[in-house]
Amino acid sequence: MDKLLNKKIKVKQSNELTEAAYYLSLKAKRVLWLCLMQTYFTASVSEDDDEMAVLGDSTFKVKVADYQQIFQVSRNQAIKDVKEGVFELSRSAVIFYPKEGSFDCVARPWLTEAGSRSARGIWEIEFNHKLLRYIYGLTNQFTTYSLRDCGSLRNPRTIRLYESLAQFKSSGLWVTTHAWLNDRFLLPESQQKNLAELKRSFLDPALKQINEKTPLLAKYSIDDSGKFLFSIIDKQNPV
């Protein structure tokens, strides 16, 4: 893992998986990230288009020591976080709304099985095989961001906002509404009804964290119709 950390670690999530993972807790997201990082180094990758070409295994090893090192927490905290994150994934399902097929709504559990080797500080996590194509990023569009950059964000809503911004990094513009933000980020009533409160207690501090701690530089304005216009710049590849 030390050798991997010396590289520019990228996590690749299909946009569908990003949508499904929005409402996971921070601990569960981190466990998922550690698995996604392994897909980047184990799946076959085309040098031309950087697209995952071959599915890898459905079982991943999550090490407490890796969690501790990457997210800068104590050993005891890492043990607790990984366990709780794995348990949350094991209880959760991904909801899909397919446009084709027999069903218009499908729930698929994240995991088939998860087992711990406490003495070695390792969890072995087996994902539902029907989710593998999402986990390995085999859809046409996916979000790419640095694991360490994400790890520096602490607030779940800030992370969700970062993920949304990252999806529009290539275009540099994201247009949305107050109603969409309410639904997506499960905003408290005070932020749902009061635009000034939304800006003061969520958007402004969240963007401050994102601008300071990630490769993105984002700001927003509100047009005459009330739509939110987010401009997004990649600091590493500015236009």
Curated annotation (Swiss-Prot):
Family matches, as InterPro entries: Initiator_Rep_WH1, WH-like_DNA-bd_sf, WH_DNA-bd_sf
SUPFAM superfamilies xrefs: Winged helix' DNA-binding domain
Record has NADP as a keyword: no
Source species, domain of life: Bacteria
Keyword set, alphabetical order: Plasmid
Gene Ontology BP annotations: DNA replication initiation
GO molecular function: DNA-directed DNA polymerase activity
UniProt KW Zinc-finger keyword: no
One Pfam family, short name: Rep3_N
Family that this chain belongs to: Belongs to the initiator RepB protein family.
UniProt function note: Mutations in ORF 239 affects the incN plasmid pUC1 E.coli polA-independence but not its autonomous replication ability.
Name of the molecule in the record: Uncharacterized 27.6 kDa protein
Taxon lineage: Bacteria, Pseudomonadati, Pseudomonadota, Gammaproteobacteria, Enterobacterales
